[in-house]
Amino acid sequence: MVVVLIISMLFMAAVPAYQRVQRKARASAIANDFRVFSAVFQAKAHETGAWPAEASAGVVPAGITTQEIKTDIWSHASPMGGKFDWDNNQVHPGGTSPGGRWRAALAINSTADAPLLLDYALMTEIDRALDDGNLTTGSFRLGFGDCPLYILEP
C-alpha cells in the first residue's frame, strides 16, 4: 500500500514536468517553422518585388516552389493542430493597414481535417521565442479567431 502511494506521488510530480517539456518542444518546433517560412516569403518578396498571392490554409501559395519550402510541413497539421496559412492583406485584430489589415503575415488556422487547439500557454511560449511574450503586441500575436499570427509586414 505504501509502495503504491509513493509511486502515485512520484507520478503526480512527473506529469506536470513532462507536460512542460512537451509544450516547450512544440513551441520550439512551431517557432522554428515560423522563422523558416518567414525567411522564404521575405526572400520571395525581395526577388519579385511583391508578396505572394493569398492562399488557403495548408495550400502553398503560387510562386513558392518545393525547392524553397518544405511543402509537407506546410500542408500537414502543425504540432498544435491547424495548418500554416499565408495571409496577404487580410483582416486581423490590430491590423495597421486600411480596414484593419496586415500587409503580410503567416498564420496557423483550423481546417476540416486539422482543427486548431487554442492553447494560450503554448502560444505565449511561441511568442517568447519569436517576440516579446505578449500576445497582444509585437510581430507574433493572436489573429482573427485567436489563431497564432506572425506578422512580416504591417
Positions of predicted regions on the chain:
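Extracellular/periplasmic head regions of type IV pilus-like filament subunits
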Residues: 42, 46-126, 151-153
